[in-house]
Amino acid sequence: MTQIHQINDIDVHRITSGQVITDLTTAVKELVDNSIDANANQIEIIFKDYGLESIECSDNGDGIDPSNYEFLALKHYTSKIAKFQDVAKVQTLGFRGEALSSLCGIAKLSVITTTSPPKADKLEYDMVGHITSKTTTSRNKGTTVLVSQLFHNLPVRQKEFSKTFKRQFTKCLTVIQGYAIINAAIKFSVWNITPKGKKNLILSTMRNSSMRKNISSVFGAGGMRGLEEVDLVLDLNPFKNRMLGKYTDDPDFLDLDYKIRVKGYISQNSFGCGRNSKDRQFIYVNKRPVEYSTLLKCCNEVYKTFNNVQFPAVFLNLELPMSLIDVNVTPDKRVILLHNERAVIDIFKTTLSDYYNRQELALPKRMCSQSEQQAQKRLKTEVFDDRSTTHESDNENYHTARSESNQSNHAHFNSTTGVIDKSNGTELTSVMDGNYTNVTDVIGSECEVSVDSSVVLDEGNSSTPTKKLPSIKTDSQNLSDLNLNNFSNPEFQNITSPDKARSLEKVVEEPVYFDIDGEKFQEKAVLSQADGLVFVDNECHEHTNDCCHQERRGSTDTEQDDEADSIYAEIEPVEINVRTPLKNSRKSISKDNYRSLSDGLTHRKFEDEILEYNLSTKNFKEISKNGKQMSSIISKRKSEAQENIIKNKDELEDFEQGEKYLTLTVSKNDFKKMEVVGQFNLGFIIVTRKVDNKYDLFIVDQHASDEKYNFETLQAVTVFKSQKLIIPQPVELSVIDELVVLDNLPVFEKNGFKLKIDEEEEFGSRVKLLSLPTSKQTLFDLGDFNELIHLIKEDGGLRRDNIRCSKIRSMFAMRACRSSIMIGKPLNKKTMTRVVHNLSELDKPWNCPHGRPTMRHLMELRDWSSFSKDYEI
């Protein structure tokens, strides 16, 4: 047995240091925390080669007393707390005494500090935090900490850092932005020195400003667009009694005013005021930047109920007593625990919803350009010029139909009062006779149409509820009444004709002639697709027809369409199964009640079909005997299947076995192992898969599968053509977005965006657009460029070569759809095998670009209980 022994102090220090400082972001965060705790109002951070060479953090804080030089970089030496109980009352960002000690363990650390300028001391520390050298220098009051050669003694981390230092620098800037926004009294300056020695200003804020000004300084002039100040109070005093025994034993807790104040800025709920991503969501607790995913999720859910296409920009600070939170959770102290979190989230959600309910909805107003207005005027003039020749004759028809409709209480349109009275399905007459798809085709674009009143639709005797329709105002006085049929689909105009509907009914209502024991009989019947052939009494049938005709005359246009569809469905060929008895509305039919027909009677046969029935007793007995035998066989097979099911259940009493049995997993490699059975309905491929003695049956959509393969092929190999601009267009970006562009130039070039990087310009203004992608009539602009930046930031970085903006993705999806195997095409086995095997090469083979699933599981063949139900009588 291996002997237990103690790890030496140096190795322990190296192990624990790697847990505290994990990347560039945590290293910079610890330095900023120390500067803020030192009461500094000016913090300057200088990166050399994006932090790959060194990081320097300078402040004008209190400085370090010479008596503390020896303990400055030792593990767990701090001036913030003296005992564990102090953690619940700590007001500083740091308190554990691990930051500088951990930095010594993974990098080279030097400190320049003074409390009485201009004389200052420069201190250098070794890996365990001991002073190796002390020299005298000069500086203003404050402290400068220099961290160089980060992760120099950790080969794996150093190699990873050298590969991803720009990406880590971008993440680090996001953290610094969070500090700069909430600390309005501190001036932040962030610089980067390139390997060539050029110093670039990346981020800067003003001292003694406000959160509003800091947001504008960090994110530019448009940073405050759509934001609104918020000040909410969450009253949790009703929950104090429940918390007293569950969360704390402090008797003074009952005297505490348990209210949380939420202050800051959040996006308005109007469309266009939010953002397309969650890149600007910051939560603070007592001005401490934290990662509070639960609260942010609540904000996003509430915002989605008002604006379901965007995400809110969130800058919220929670002010509450320190005794109600626990910040000692993770080494970076960015994850906190909140007492009675569920109640806090529920009250916050309700309060935020009430806040948004009080807001007024602000819609962006679209202003038409002068060219659009002129084009609409020309269109409207041409339309009315074309109609002027037939206007007089239409007016005559209009007045005639108007008078007739008024006398018969039919529908008419009153253009002055905006009221439509509609009954009995009479058409409305219009001066325009065209098959227009919508009103704007005639009267112009949305710039000339205002919807400010309602049109009341009175159905008269119809049972359809009253509808309110928007009225339309135009400058033209020629529009009086609108014909509803002008806006209907021409294909359905013939269907709704009453004459044709009645003619179809005559075909359906022809009598049926049949022969029983040599005598011919005639009966009226109705043939429907749902019920088959149904016999009805003469009086009842005539009464029903009268009711149907009356109801048809009073029905609406929609009812006429539905009726016509049902009529067409009724006249479809129906296969009559002689094993199924004909349905009859009468309880019994005696032979004497049938009307005998003479031998010389001439008549038309119903669809040329003759129904022959042999009603002999012998056949009935034979059928009954066969039915009993079949029923016994079916019952026996059912019992055997039930026994197998019970046996399987008994074998799956173990939870793991049961879960494994009920769980079906399919990997991309399984597509290569699937065997093609055949094609179903000229649209689907039936395949089988054998895994662990299980035979699964799958159905594969031939069109969706081939479309997905073609789509991902286009995504991977297509390089978009681009159109050069006459003058290169400068692109104003935030520092983080610019770094994303610089780190992913091949992705933008593949999407057709040709860029030029001017290293002499300041950060945020170095990118210039040389050309835009082009494809026939599709236009691209800076919005697509910004969308591509967002998609790259959201991507995990594994397959960035396939990132495309939404317009290009839609074009690829359409091309892939049109070039794929269509539904209805017969396939041979070789083609079906190729389609199925291609799915194994795709990144995400489970859905086509339009969302259709490529495959579904049908059953496990081993558990198939055959078609026993089909043989039941």
Swiss-Prot record:
Mutation effect (residue 95 to A): Displays an increase in spontaneous mutation accumulation. Does not impair heterodimer formation
Impact when changing residue 857 to R: Confers a strong defect in the repair of primer strand-specific 1-bp loops during DNA replication, but not during meoitic recombination. Does not impair heterodimer formation
Effect of residue 400 to S: In strain: SK1, YJM320, YJM339 and YJM421
Stated consequence of mutating residue 384 to V: In strain: SK1, YJM320, YJM339 and YJM421
DNA- and ATP-binding: annotated span: 1-357
Location of region: Interaction with MLH1: 661-873
InterPro entries: DNA_mismatch_repair_CS, DNA_mismatch_S5_2-like, HATPase_C_sf, MutL/Mlh/PMS, MutL/Mlh/Pms-like, MutL_C, MutL_C_dimsub, MutL_C_regsub
Extent of Polar residues compositional bias: 403-423
Record GO terms (molecular function): ATP binding; ATP hydrolysis activity; ATP-dependent DNA damage sensor activity; mismatched DNA binding
Recorded consequence of changing residue 112 to T: In strain: SK1 and YJM421
GO biological process: meiotic mismatch repair; mismatch repair
Signal peptide as annotated in the record: none
CDD domains: HATPase_MutL-MLH-PMS-like, MutL_Trans_hPMS_2_like
Family the entry assigns: Belongs to the DNA mismatch repair MutL/HexB family.
Protein name (database record): DNA mismatch repair protein PMS1
Originating organism: Saccharomyces cerevisiae (strain ATCC 204508 / S288c)
